Amino acid sequence: MLVWLFGWLGQYYAPFSAVSSLTLRALLAVITALAFSMIFGSRVIRRLRALKYGQAIRNDGPQSHLVKTGTPTMGGVLILSAIGVSTLLWARLNNPYVWILLIVMIIFGAVGWADDWLKIKYKNPKGLIARKKYFWLSMGALFVGISLYYIATLQPNVVTTREMQDLLLPIFKDWMIPFSAVPFGIGFIIFTYFVINGASNAVNLTDGLDGLAILPVVLVAAGLGAMAYVSGDVRFADYLHVPYIAYNSEVIIVCGAMIGAGLGFLWFNAHPAQVFMGDVGALSLGAMLGTIAVMTRQEIAFAIMGGLFVAEALSVMLQVGSYKLRKKRVFRMAPLHHHFEEIGWKETQVVARFWIIAIILVILGLMTLKLR
């Protein structure tokens, strides 16, 4: 929004034209979202307390977590508001990828909000009925897949259907999985569905300790932002052998907003947490990361960078599967972070060590760009 205003003002005073710079706008998006979170964070927490929107803690979880009962939840509303305001201010709003990401944020955020609200209303950590929850999450993921496919169909001068669909394989320069060989984009749409829903639920499962999920979200958003920058610049895309998709240039503004909003939220979510993001934050942030990975065609690199989220999700799948088949547990408790608590790690140790792993994984994911 402001990029057009400053562009017009630049006709009369040249320094205003600098705001059209993508890098500067990305930095301004970070600063705006961070400032928004810091300014309104305490007010949001007070309001959540006044509304008695306290977290319901599972009795079968770690006993040390029972002291967190009543800590305000649904703090993801603060994160999403900061992302929305910052993106609307600094992104070029004629870019369809920006709007797809904002719609994803709203859809998954609304599902998460309903889940959180039901947990609070009925004092039950189960929340929204699984069938209804996954129906709406599925609708959101299918919306992304269909939208991206038809953008490629209608505007082949921006991105071809082949570039949009085929899955890049890291390290191998010309190797791809040809989803474009499946008619009508069905292969691509189904794959997109699993990427986005998988990312959304994986981040949600990771959000179980103070600060654990939000910093890895920030780190992965930064990594994907770098990949969006490369993909949206014809010179870098050609040099690094990735598809050039012009719309990805503005995706970095959304990534910047996610970074700023996440860091601002971490200020209040660090141990001992004053607020939890809840499903409204975790489901939407995970879905946005998954969507950006699909937009940039870097799903495998995303799986590497978000390896912490992958490990948390796999730990739950293994635990449930093993218990159903063998009546035995693989871990003392799932998700994975609870297992380490059960073997004696303090909460702050688990969080700090998982953060270190997340940093390493993001660096490894970024290295795949050059290795191609």
Curated annotation (Swiss-Prot):
Disulfide bonds: none annotated. CDD domains: GT_MraY (cd06852). Pfam families: Glycos_transf_4, MraY_sig1. InterPro entries: Glycosyl_transferase_4 (IPR000715), PNAcMuramoyl-5peptid_Trfase (IPR003524), PNAcMuramoyl-5peptid_Trfase_CS (IPR018480). Belongs to the glycosyltransferase 4 family. MraY subfamily. Catalyzes the initial step of the lipid cycle reactions in the biosynthesis of the cell wall peptidoglycan: transfers peptidoglycan precursor phospho-MurNAc-pentapeptide from UDP-MurNAc-pentapeptide onto the lipid carrier undecaprenyl phosphate, yielding undecaprenyl-pyrophosphoryl-MurNAc-pentapeptide, known as lipid I. This is Phospho-N-acetylmuramoyl-pentapeptide-transferase. It comes from Psychrobacter arcticus (strain DSM 17307 / VKM B-2377 / 273-4). The gene is mraY.
